[in-house]
Amino acid sequence: MHLSQLIACALLLALLSLRPSEAKPGTPPKVPRTPPGEELADSQAAGGNQKKGDKTPGSGGANLKGDRSRLLRDLRVDTKSRAAWARLLHEHPNARKYKGGNKKGLSKGCFGLKLDRIGSMSGLGC
């Protein structure tokens, strides 16, 4: 079962990688950026000598806040996508609950029918 899921995921990824332009036709290609940690450190260093309440036109305080919120939003999207892939690729943590065969009360009678509770507990079904 796991092998078939793995093969299905691999085929899906192969199909998606072959046609990236058809998946999002209206988006321009992304320009490589600096890693998020460095970008946040640069923005804090640039605005570190200004007060939070300073709203002068040349200060760029609103720009700094917008850059920081955009950066945090990008990080959240990345975390959500990683969680989705983890759920897809790993089996359910309570997989034992969903597997059959070892559930209580599934014993069969002499003719393949389920026995009543007393008969199955005592073994006097047949």
From Swiss-Prot:
Indicate, by first and last residue, each region the UniProt record lists as having compositional bias (Pro residues): 26-35
Among InterPro entries, the record links this protein to:
C_natriurtcpep, Natr_peptide, Natr_peptide_CS
GO BP, sorted A to Z: angiogenesis; animal organ development; blood vessel diameter maintenance; blood vessel remodeling; c-di-GMP signaling; cellular response to glycoprotein; cGMP biosynthetic process; cGMP-mediated signaling
Loss of this gene results in the following: Mice are viable perinatally but less than half survive postnatally due to skeletal abnormalities. They display severe dwarfism which is the consequence of a defect in endochondral ossification.
Spell out the residue ranges making up region: Disordered. Answer: 20-73
Pro-piece positions: 24-73
Pfam families, alphabetically? ANP
The record's disulfide annotation reads: 110-126
The residue range of the signal peptide is 1-23
Any one cellular-component term (Gene Ontology): extracellular space
**Highest taxon of source:** Eukaryota
Keyword Disulfide bond listed: yes
GO molecular function annotations of the record = hormone receptor binding; neuropeptide hormone activity; signaling receptor binding
Instruction: Classify the main location.
Output: secreted
Q: Where in the cell is it found?
A: Secreted
Alphabetically ordered keywords of this record: Cleavage on pair of basic residues, Disulfide bond, Hormone, Osteogenesis, Secreted, Signal, Vasoactive
Q: Which family does it belong to?
A: Belongs to the natriuretic peptide family.
Q: What is this protein called?
A: C-type natriuretic peptide
Name of the gene encoding the protein in the UniProt record = Nppc
